[in-house]
């Protein structure tokens, strides 16, 4: 079963459908694996650049899930026994 969130009902919007068709023509039906294994696609880098521009910062990094963000960031940020991270 395939599923996705559709909060804004964009899955059937004509512009979204056309962009999906074009992306499928260009990139195929999937990346083949997660970014950590298959590497970054130009779409990843473009999305991160757009987020950075929107936030007015030099760069950004998009994680695919909260868990991967925690695994990637917490060991970098937390160095001492006195540090505490609370994550939902």
Set out the residue ranges of the language-model regions.
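Fold-independent oxyanion-binding glycine-rich loops
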Residues: 4-5, 65-66, 88
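Residue-level signal for short amphipathic helical patches enriched in basic/charged
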Residues: 11, 58, 80
